[in-house]
Curated annotation (Swiss-Prot):
GO terms for molecular function: ATP binding; ATP-dependent NAD(P)H-hydrate dehydratase activity. (6S)-NADPHX binds at residues 163, 220-226, 290. It comes from the Eukaryota. InterPro entries: CARKD, Ribokinase-like. This is ATP-dependent (S)-NAD(P)H-hydrate dehydratase. It comes from Nematostella vectensis (Starlet sea anemone). GO terms for biological process: metabolite repair; nicotinamide nucleotide metabolic process.
Amino acid sequence: MGAWRNTRFIRSLSSVKRYRARFSYYSLFGGEPRACMAEKRSRSPLPAQRQIHVHNRQQEAQLLQSAKNVIPSLEETFHKGVAGRIGVIGGCQEYTGAPYFAAISALKTGADLSHVFCTSDSASVIKSYSPELIVHPLLDRTFAVNEISEWLSRLHCLVVGPGLGRNPTNLENAKRTIEKARKNKKHLVIDADGIAVVTTYPEIIKNYDSKKSKVILTPNVVEFDRLYTSVMGKAADPHGDSYEQARSLSQELGNVTICRKGQHDIITDGQTVVECSITGSNRRCGGQGDLLSGSMAVFLHWANIEVTQNPALVAAYAASGLTRWCNRLAYSRLKRSMTTSDMIQQIHQAFEELFGKE
């Protein structure tokens, strides 16, 4: 199987009204507005465009408004599946919680249907967590990719990685599923062990984006460093400019969108860099990234319908903000005993407070 190693913020938002939040900047972002913006000239072979490192609270609020605008109203004429059909590729004997968290978060964010494609020995456990998920015990089968491919035409977005594990068969099937998704022009959110797949085979997502399909990578700090080393051929400078490193990596991969998780999530498509500085809490329980990736898949589907420019940036920012707000609400009640299950219970309230919609 090979050696598996551990390995546009909208430049123009003229069509979007300025955000009029019910929250002050203090409550939303946890501090006074910072009015600093640094512009950089592109080193990309693409035509020169403004490079914006966003630390401006008003600019963040404007992006939040654009995220709000992509959320579809619930219409009487809708049928099941219109608001989103999401597939999660992951789940093995050791890790059954992660795919559940991602899939249930997609549903609670607003998707109509959520599928989990997992290994045969994890399917029963994942099914027992919720009757609302559609669980397919396929991932460890010899012809898994062919069977998963039959479902691709019915899905709007795939989340690859939650609970995938490091079994070579699972990793190989995840890799081939990404390749199939690319041929079928499907949106992708790649997280966790899916990042390990991309770290080993970065060519499978290089130049992935088109008008019909987008990909978002959601590495944490360690995963980002491994991916950076693999793609750039050198280690990331721990004292260097994190914004510039994220932008450079995105450019090298063909301007795919990266959401580098951290104290403040850094989001870039290689042309524009934005920061989500909405405050959560200092509690770092496992599984928060699964809530992020599941909700991000839904927003990516919505944004690609409503936004013609930088839909992946809008989706990544919306999901980042939602996850942080869930963390904040759950922590305010439970403090250090808070877990990701508690955060998921806050999705409804966080969604209403952050986006002003039911």
